Amino acid sequence: MERSPGEGPSPSPTDQPSAPSDPTGQPPAAHAKPDPGSGGQPAGPGAAGEALAVLTSFGKRLLVLIPVYLAGAVGLSVGFVLFGLALYLGWRRVRDEKERSLRAARQLLDDEEQLTAKTLYMSHRELPAWVSFPDVEKAEWLNKIVAQVWPFLGQYMEKLLAETVAPAVRGSNPHLQTFTFTRVELGEKPLRIIGVKVHPGQRKEQILLDLNISYVGDVQIDVEVKKYFCKAGVKGMQLHGVLRVILEPLIGDLPIVGAVSMFFIRRPTLDINWTGMTNLLDIPGLSSLSDTMIMDSIAAFLVLPNRLLVPLVPDLQDVAQLRSPLPRGIIRIHLLAARGLTSKDKYVKGLIEGKSDPYALVRLGTQTFCSRVIDEELNPQWGETYEVMVHEVPGQEIEVEVFDKDPDKDDFLGRMKLDVGKVLQAGVLDDWFPLQGGQGQVHLRLEWLSLLSDAEKLEQVLQWNQGVSSRPEPPSAAILVVYLDRAQDLPLKKGNKEPNPMVQLSIQDVTQESKAVYSTNCPVWEEAFRFFLQDPQSQELDVQVKDDSRALTLGALTLPLARLLTAPELILDQWFQLSSSGPNSRLYMKLVMRILYLDSSEICFPTVPGCPGAWDVDSENPQRGSSVDAPPRPCHTTPDSQFGTEHVLRIHVLEAQDLIAKDRFLGGLVKGKSDPYVKLKLAGRSFRSHVVREDLNPRWNEVFEVIVTSVPGQELEVEVFDKDLDKDDFLGRCKVSLTTVLNSGFLDEWLTLEDVPSGRLHLRLERLTPRPTAAELEEVLQVNSLIQTQKSAELAAALLSIYMERAEDLPLRKGTKHPSPYATLTVGDTSHKTKTVSQTSAPVWDESASFLIRKPHTENLELQVRGEGTGVLGSLSLPLSELLVADQLCLDRWFTLNSGQGQVLLRAQLGILVSQHSGVEAHSHSYSHSSSSLSEEPELSGGPPHVTSSAPELRQRLTHVDSSLEAPAGPLGQVKLTVWYYSEERKLVSIVHGCRALRQNGRDPPDPYVSLLLLPDKNRGTKRKTSQKKRTLSPEFNERFEWELPLDEAQRRKLDVSVKSNPSFMSRERELLGKVQLDLAETDLSQGVARWYDLMDDKDKGSS
């Protein structure tokens, strides 16, 4: 049977191949059978698609050639074709960059953690510039709420645009009568809040929140003007920035918050992906212009000083002031100079390197200033001054960018940023700041001007400003804030038409305009305007109310600002009658003036004679205040409020009980004890006691001291270990809150050891607060000698606080190069090194250090200023005895370095550590003769000892005894002793303080020492002696000796004290200068009082 040519072969059922398994999991029905009419050849699934793709590609290339053909047809040159090609390539590049940035941002939000780890090594072009890791609290709970609400917010936006915005656009212009929104979708990517940071408000009635917001959305909004077949839209958007939300005022009624203010502290980052006709906005040049215009529109109502206010309660007072509050202060920025800038100009195709033509842009929020251009200079001197209003601290930043001026495009030379909070804290900040993104430094002097609400210091400010060299504008003495509220009964236009009033406010040559309010003669503006005033006594505010055409004047007002100077708190809040207007036309305004005052308490002005660093002033033209040409040098330091607020914590590690036995002998068959010691950690310091051998109830009786601050959350960590040859065994730990000790001042407790079955530790903690008076120093030294333990370091009697602010006129390296100086402060064996300030002979350190002082009369502060790699630039030795005679024990001034070149400004402040719970009384209570006030229980009965008297009583006894010590000494002189019984260690303690008026037998003074013997024993076990002093009749020893014996046995002994001298190097004989014998049974061992004892003669010469 013949087949027609159109028929294909008919395969038999056995010849038909089985359907292959679909790897994609599609059902068998998806595989279509061949069409009988297809000639027997099954069409491939992508055949039609491939053909369509080829045709589309061919069509695109043909469309590209059409403009070329048309250009040739109309006789245009090839330059037009090349220009169009360049325009297209630029547009394509901008589009690709936007799409790549949008994809990277979306992918980052989809898998934030994993992608961040991968993109750490990406180039800066691939990783979005806004990606940061702010030190804020996460707010995932808030993001979940936003994600849930996002679809409903999209529905609201669709209704808002279709029902409100679209009719308004159609009514605004006859050509837009067919304007409509064809598509409104917010997409599936909601706004994300990266973190929230809460700041303490300036007032108690406000709460400040910073929201780090990031929106990388797939929003799609399309519009169409059907009459002109015009389509446009947005497909994708990025918005990143810090939105500050202020809840203010807080009220006593629901909803608790009266209003919410929102604004961006700095301009946010915005990137829009256009579609349709708005694709033209991605053309290079138009792209940056359109982005700038959009950002300017956003900044006009949502970037400082503008803010969005949402009242939450009706009839809220001072809405205008909430919408535009007074500035926190004014910063006067002196842009002085720059140095070491990069050379950007090239000549002869780059073969010859030129210099740069630098200028600077200074920004704070929306306030921007541009300096003049300095031609061909890498170390320009500008000497310009700008004044900016600061609205939010912290948050706002001063930004300075330096550019090289070129005919085509200016080259970037570097930038610096500084938080205004540092200027507020310093008051005056004068420094060289390094430029980031380039090289070199810029010299700024920043002055924080406070706002005063009275005119008392206006004359002083005006006098200061006369000496300020300021350009391009003279310095301001005050600011004026005008709150323009509303007007009433303005005159109508011709034909009794309602006017469209707006207001022009002018002070000298500065004019600002309000918005226009349409079709009303009773407009409400609620706007604020700010002016700088050079001389409020002579300036005037000129107000013109006009129609929006500016041709018709509806009213005028001229107000001398001198009226404000006599008003309460420099405020006028009232109606003002308009002239050249209707009979009842008036304007309601609130005017607030504030005087700009630079706190001069820390600044030396030339009117102060003899101040180091004051200017040389011409008597005919005295300069007052701060000057760019001759900036004042401070006479005193300006430390922060935390300087000098440290305390000293004295830690007595007394004893422990019931510790765990860790030692084992004979392979663990024999159980031993432990060799315990204590480790303490606090404020970054660690201490360790001595080891007590084989004792489960050890006594350490050691004292440690550490400098602490009142920062909350600190803890004293105590751990007990058993000392072993290999690894020390853990015996327990405990913690004590430092805040508890600082608040109570004293803590004496048995603390249970944690993480072990048994054991407890006895600690005594005492807070010592420095006092700026030397009257109690001798008593403090006396008390310290009484409570000093043999195995502890000498106790501190004072705390020295040093604030190193700055240095000036340091010597240069090799005569021409600036050093990189740092300072080292040393007292005894403790040192502190400041930071290194790069390449300057006038470094500013602003650092503080504290030292424990044991002997203020004899110790010195050693200061060395060194250069990194250059050695010593200068040194200073300050005896602390000078502080003891200074007012408030403080020296705050410039000190000249010993090198003769250079000075340092520092503050040295001494505080005497007076103990309120000395511990001497606690030691002595168990054996006082006044039994009526004492506890009968032994000291180790399980609780802390009962303190029966206080340190002031001890000091009173010491003062009383010292007052009677001026009796004349006997013929052989006197020896000063303190004898008492230390009950906690069960020891008899004697302190040999010194001798006076000793006998001189020969031509030369003796070399005295003191020998002590505890009778009736005369063996070496009870014998003690001091060191020997050379050639003196009044030696000072201050040495402590101990004998371990019970109290009842000590009261049966006699203490034999002999003062001897070694007259000859070769002789073993010792000359007895005098002796005294104390019957301890007749001595009050509970008092611990230092006394002078007359030395007696003894015919028998003793030998060592």
UniProtKB/Swiss-Prot annotation:
Q: What functional role does this protein have?
A: Binds calcium (via the C2 domains) and translocates to sites of contact between the endoplasmic reticulum and the cell membrane in response to increased cytosolic calcium levels. Helps tether the endoplasmic reticulum to the cell membrane and promotes the formation of appositions between the endoplasmic reticulum and the cell membrane. Acts as an inhibitor of ADGRD1 G-protein-coupled receptor activity in absence of cytosolic calcium. Binds glycerophospholipids in a barrel-like domain and may play a role in cellular lipid transport.
The segments labelled Disordered in the record are 1-47, 617-641, 813-833, 924-950
Q: Where are the transmembrane segments?
A: 39-59, 63-83
Q: Where is it found, in Gene Ontology cellular component terms? A: endoplasmic reticulum membrane; plasma membrane
Give the multimer and partner information.
Answer: Interacts with ESYT2 and ESYT3. Interacts with ADGRD1; inhibiting the G-protein-coupled receptor activity of ADGRD1. Interaction with ADGRD1 is abolished when cytosolic calcium increases, relieving ADGRD1 G-protein-coupled receptor activity. Interacts (phosphorylated form) with SLC2A4.
Report the protein name in the record.
Extended synaptotagmin-1
What does the entry list as the binding residues for Ca(2+) 3?
Answer: D406, D408, D410
Residues with the Phosphotyrosine modification? Y1009
Cytoplasmic topological intervals: 1-38, 84-1104
Q: Which residues form the C2 domain?
A: 312-433, 460-580, 627-751, 777-899, 971-1093
Organism of origin is: Pongo abelii (Sumatran orangutan)
Question: Which example biological process does GO assign this protein?
Answer: endoplasmic reticulum-plasma membrane tethering
- Residue stretches in coiled coil: 91-116
| Lumenal side, ranges | 60-62
Q: Could you tell me which Pfam families the record lists for this protein?
A: C2, SMP_LBD
Q: Which residues carry this modification: Phosphothreonine?
A: T948
Residues annotated to bind Ca(2+) 1: K344, D345, D404, D406, D411
